[in-house]
Amino acid sequence: MLDTLKNLIKKLPFDFTKNQAYDTQTNAIIKRVCKKNSNCLDIGCHKGEVLDVIVHHAPDGHHFGFEPIPSMYKTLVTKYANTNCTIHEVALSNTSGVSVFNHVVSNPAYSGLEKRAYDKPNEVDEQIEVKTEKLDILFDKKTPIDLIKIDVEGGELNVLEGAIETIKRTKPVIIFEHGLGASEFYDSSPEKVFALFTSLNYNISLMKSWLDDKSSFTLDEFKNQFYEKRNYYFIAYPK
């Protein structure tokens, strides 16, 4: 029933929910940024919905998906078996090793290295072990990257900290989630995220603002987005 409702909402001629608006904006950014041979990373690949869009707009590139939940990883490997996509069964972070991972069985999209707040009272979760790795260690130093999408339920700062050299080298456009209810469980904050991107000479904007060529956020503006729960999906891009 829930999947049927979601499919009906997707067919509406307007954005019914904030998540649907984010999806529309993400698709528009991918279309604008990617050339046919662009290479992209989907960190927190889940079912591959964003990766599908990437493959459509960059059919000649080499793309990489990262998904630590074993069952979802296996599904992705099968789905992309005969494509130009490589799927890694790993949780990207700022450390290398093995870590406990909170798998939300009833709502896998809420899963992460730390247990986040839930919107519903009866979510069912379990603790599993997953491999963690820094993108800087895992990724080929010679491959150019045009776009990175990060949706890891609060762990985005850790992912970014483990990808500093890759970002410096390739200067990709980065679409990322950062919201109250998840990010604070990783000792993350908009101040820390803003400082990291500033050190990389990056701006942060709403996706819609970037698409409309509007100005980027100041620190105070970005903080207000987070603490007042105005938005939780953003784009970072080189100045």
Regions found by a protein language model. Give the residues of each.
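Phosphate/nucleotide-binding beta-alpha loop and adjacent structural elements of enzyme active sites
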Residues: 1-239
